[in-house]
């Protein structure tokens, strides 16, 4: 019979697997928590596509409320988002709600036809938060009414971000850098 330490040794010597060529298509979701898509920092997800997705964020019914952002995507190379809409419950908003979309450590990405705002109407968080991203395009997207900042970026110098044909007339600020 093998000991637990035998399994742990095998795991530590194993190579990381690769996950690539993923498609999420035509989804309507009613969420009560943050949705997370996360690759490994040493082996990011590759070639990830999200098409025609509507997310409706609702108040959590548990006592231990953890939802912050609607969708967090982390450690991805080659991300394409086409037609993503995020709506927040305005009747019973959660105090911890922040951004509609968060990208962390994402390279070679394209966001086309995004529509949304931050979680709390007239709150201080951005609709789209970008942290350690590179070679990206955000185009033909729209800030919804009550949007504070449409896009917030960290690491301005390294990003290679292109913005094109976005409708930010309903946002107080189109982009900010922190």
Residue ranges and their predicted role:
Residues 1-178:
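Extracellular/periplasmic carbohydrate-active domains that bind, remodel
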């Amino acid at each position: 019979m093998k000991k637990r330490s035998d399994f742990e040794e095998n795991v530590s010597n194993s190579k990381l697997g690769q996950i690539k060529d993923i498609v999420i298509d035509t989804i309507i979701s009613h969420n009560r928590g943050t949705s997370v898509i996360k690759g490994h920092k040493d082996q990011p997800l590759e070639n990830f596509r999200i098409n025609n997705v509507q997310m409706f964020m609702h108040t959590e019914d548990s006592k231990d409320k953890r939802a912050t952002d609607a969708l967090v995507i982390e450690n991805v190379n080659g991300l394409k988002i086409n037609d993503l809409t995020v709506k927040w419950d305005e009747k019973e908003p959660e105090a911890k709600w922040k951004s509609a979309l968060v990208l962390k450590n994402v390279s070679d990405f394209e966001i086309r036809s995004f529509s949304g705002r931050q979680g709390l109407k007239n709150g201080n968080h951005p609709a789209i938060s970008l942290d350690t991203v590179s070679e990206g395009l955000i185009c033909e997207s729209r800030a919804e009414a009550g949007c504070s900042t449409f896009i917030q970026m960290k690491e301005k110098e390294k990003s290679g971000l292109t913005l094109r044909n976005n409708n930010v007339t309903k946002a107080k600020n189109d982009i900010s850098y922190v």
